[in-house]
Amino acid sequence: MKAAIKFQYSGDDTDGYEIRILAGDREAWVGGSLARNNGLGDLVRAATAIATGQWTVDMWHGEGTPCHRVRFSIVRVESNGAADQQWGVRVEVHDAAAFDRLVQPPRIDLIVPSALALAEIVYSDTAPDVT
């Protein structure tokens, strides 16, 4: 199954952004305003500053009881051996109940340039484990 993720700035909040997640015939939108504390620009800066990765940002999406939680993790990715390492971003999508029970959530792994271009990135669900 192919899936895609698209980063874009929100039209309603200049400090915010939206993430569109497509998986098969399912589509989910998450969005928020983290620019004051942990925005996308901070993710880029963290990627260049923290060599070991595992720096995470959590974001809730939903009214009242959150229906999704999104976690961004900066990780080091080996694509084709140690000589070809680059920064990657792991995106985990949780439902709130599963997250609270610490159930293993579905995981989406993607490799992006360190610039985190605000463009659609296509990946497959057979992405390598980057832990």
Question: Where do the model's predicted regions map?
Answer:
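Long protein-protein interaction modules used by eukaryotic assembly/scaffold proteins
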Residues: 71-131
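N-terminal low-complexity, intrinsically disordered segments
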Residues: 1-83, 88-96
